């Protein structure tokens, strides 16, 4: 081999050795998001929509160059809606996959399990859909943040709605049906608290506790009809809501009482699954609505989701979309995804302009509870064929201001975790 050629090969080899760390660093400049969403079963649509919307947000951000030189990478594992399995995956994400953020979760049981892992490993967990208030009050820890309304906010809005309705359409008695775990119990407890807080007179005539994903609600439906409440408050979500309403229709339940479902009842999944079967005049709400607010930003989000998936989004989609943008803003402020404590400070108080924000309002993360603060709209089912296959959507909106829906200080002092109480001093 000629001497000149051999020297060139040696020089090339040295260059490869010297530059390898830089190439590796460049390849490692990613913000890795490890998500856990259910992809099958009654909760499956929530997971499918969440993943699609998160991918939308990642693509939008990466198309603009990423954040501070970092590209976003999103991975998801089917949580199977099982807390124990989700904990195993989360630990694998952290130790093997080296994710920078934990993300997602639909079931509150899964969310409550994952927040323990987040705290143990000091890895930020962005909650995008599960709604139990416990994660932002009773069990709040430094590295947990939620970017969708929790049950306390929904029940505060619900209590205000019932207070207003009592003046024009008098009612006295309430019954409640919801799933027998934290999410279901939180709703009725927080509704009672807020009804009392706002001075509403009421009497509870029945509480009914089917298991999550129960196949048959007949016994509960007949008990409700026997107890004859003026208002039936429902705490189901997802496929459970659809199944309950379809099973209750032959009994004429919705003609005999007000059906009121202020947390998850207004999900587009219900509208698309029931069509003309869905009675008019049900009072529902959710964490995002495809037809409220009527802003350009909300229309764009809904249209972009439809272009990507061929269907309109359930409310879970916007929560996942918001979560990715919260991560991007935090990394942009800190400069990297590695300093968890700096990222916590960046997230506390963060303003997030989201598709669900009406004109003149911007969502923000409460620095005390790490809970996003948002307005909530409650509506009635009305005829509307703008979002097929649904033939019903919500209308006749009542909108409740964000700050009045948050837990008051005395509630936080009584129920808060040690971490939250330390912030209140």
Predicted regions, residues:
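Bacterial N-terminal signal peptides that target proteins for export
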Residues: 1-11
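Bacterial N-terminal signal peptides
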Residues: 10-21
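Signal peptide-proximal N-terminal region
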Residues: 28-31, 51-74, 196-202
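Extracytoplasmic ligand/sensor domains, especially the bilobed periplasmic-binding protein
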Residues: 99-207, 256-281
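Extracellular/periplasmic periplasmic-binding protein-like sensory domains
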Residues: 248-321, 332-334, 338, 391-424
């Amino acid at each position: 081999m000629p001497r000149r050629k051999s020297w060139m090969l040696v020089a090339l080899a040295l260059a490869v050795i010297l530059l390898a760390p830089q190439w590796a660093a460049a390849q490692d400049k990613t913000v890795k998001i490890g998500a856990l969403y259910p992809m099958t079963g009654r909760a499956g649509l929530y997971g499918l929509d969440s993943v699609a919307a998160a991918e939308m947000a990642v693509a939008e951000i990466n198309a603009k160059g990423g954040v501070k030189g970092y590209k976003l990478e999103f991975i998801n594992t089917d949580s199977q809606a099982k807390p124990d399995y989700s904990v195993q995956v989360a630990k694998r994400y952290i130790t093997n996959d080296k994710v920078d953020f934990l993300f997602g979760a639909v079931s509150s049981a899964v969310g409550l399990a994952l927040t323990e892992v987040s705290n143990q490993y000091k890895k930020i967990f962005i909650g995008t859909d599960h709604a139990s208030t416990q994660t932002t009050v009773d069990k709040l820890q430094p590295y947990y943040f939620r970017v969708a309304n929790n049950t306390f906010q929904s029940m505060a809005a619900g209590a205000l709605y019932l207070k207003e309705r009592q003046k024009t359409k008098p009612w006295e008695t309430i019954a409640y049906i919801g799933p027998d775990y934290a999410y279901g119990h939180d709703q009725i407890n927080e509704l009672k608290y807020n009804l009392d807080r706002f001075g509403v007179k009421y009497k509870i005539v029945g509480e009914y506790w089917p298991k999550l994903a129960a196949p048959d609600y007949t016994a509960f439906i007949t008990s409700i009809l026997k107890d004859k409440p003026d208002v039936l408050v429902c705490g189901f979500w997802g496929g459970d809501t659809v199944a309950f309403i379809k099973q209750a229709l032959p009994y004429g339940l919705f003609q005999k009482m007000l059906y009121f479902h202020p947390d998850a009842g207004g999900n587009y999944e219900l509208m698309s699954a029931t069509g003309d079967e869905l009675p008019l005049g049900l009072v529902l709400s959710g964490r995002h609505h495809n037809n409220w607010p009527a802003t350009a930003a909300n229309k764009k989000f809904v249209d972009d989701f439809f272009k990507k998936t061929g269907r309109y989004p359930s409310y879970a989609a916007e929560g996942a979309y918001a979560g990715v943008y919260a991560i991007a803003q935090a990394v942009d402020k800190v400069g990297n995804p590695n300093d968890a404590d700096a990222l916590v400070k960046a997230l506390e108080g963060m303003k997030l302009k989201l598709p669900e924000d009406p004109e003149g309002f911007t969502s923000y993360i409460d620095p005390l509870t790490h809970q996003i603060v948002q307005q909530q709209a409650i509506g009635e089912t009305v005829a509307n064929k703008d979002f097929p296959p649904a033939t019903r959507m919500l209308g006749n909106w009542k909108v409740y201001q964000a700050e009045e829906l948050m837990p008051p200080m005395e509630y936080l002092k009584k129920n808060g975790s040690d971490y939250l109480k330390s912030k209140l001093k």
